[in-house]
């Protein structure tokens, strides 16, 4: 542990800067969801074809999270952060300039590489940089940065894209990253690598059936969500026939409802995590089934989005709590795996949505997304009954 000799103010500033970085990294992952139609238009492509960009990004992050974590495990953290930020910013400049769709995809792969390394080291960095005795708060700040990406990052990115073109959105994210990088260079001390967990802990984690079951649940439920969510923007405009502005409002509502979800989880998550997660999966299932019927009216879609946003936030937080509770001895590796598995789900959902939109009809994304959601609901009830107490959050000694 690096001895924390700096003032509390500086310690918090460091953590806040990391949280802002988390916000930026997650915004760029999700922002194409709000820009699909615009990108498709500028390259004369079908919206459904552009969606493959989400899958490529998510799967690169999923595949590279663990290898990158192991490759960089001995590197000094400050240098590593600066390096990955430079890659991140350069790739955004390339996105801004992308002269065809392939170049855009290549630039996104560069961003995904930076993303994979960033997520495998930030949680442990936030804990190290936090003021004494404030580890849990540091982690929750990081989680807030992540959550705000869905709540604010995506809709703001879409609004910028609507008024100034999607390229400007990517440029703005790159600019935000540059400012954050300058703050990190100024604020961060040298951070030699610590025991970040090595491959040795992998077999140990794979031998925990409860943890593996949570990972499986994560991938299935995330696939269900992203099957519909990836194409919500063209769905609102093409299938439901509402305006581009309403699509923006809907993304804001969906994200904003996540705040309600996180407050609910904060209040009830410690005691009733399992019940809360299963109920949220049931709620997600209902939202997906009702997506097409609700598309008759803007009000119905807006109300549905509130419940959908609450559900997905509770699911995401609940899974994280369970993973941390089941792997207190190897948090880096367990969270890196979690991030990888989450991204496999994002990529799979976006791919399923893409295939449905191309070969069936975009109006079916909700119904077909409901199939994995139903599987997830049944699976969650089974595993929470099998491992009831072990899965609730253990009191942390932070």
UniProtKB/Swiss-Prot annotation:
Domain of life from the UniProt record: Bacteria
Coiled coil: none
Subcellular compartments: Cell inner membrane
Keywords: Cell inner membrane, Cell membrane, Membrane, Sugar transport, Transmembrane, Transmembrane helix, Transport
Pfam families, A to Z: MFS_1
Membrane topology, from the record: Multi-pass membrane protein
A GO cellular component entry from the record: plasma membrane
Keyword Cell membrane: yes
Main location: membrane
One annotated GO molecular function: carbohydrate transmembrane transporter activity
Annotated InterPro entries: MFS, MFS_dom, MFS_Efflux_Transporters, MFS_trans_sf, Sugar_effux_transptr_put
TM region(s), chain numbering: 15-35, 50-70, 81-101, 103-123, 136-156, 169-189, 209-229, 246-266, 275-295, 301-321, 333-353, 364-384
NCBIfam families membership: PRK03545.1
Task of the protein: Involved in the efflux of sugars. The physiological role may be the reduction of the intracellular concentration of toxic sugars or sugar metabolites.
Similarity-based family: Belongs to the major facilitator superfamily. SotB (TC 2.A.1.2) family.
Record protein name field: Probable sugar efflux transporter
Higher taxonomy: Bacteria, Pseudomonadati, Pseudomonadota, Gammaproteobacteria, Enterobacterales
Gene name in the database record: sotB
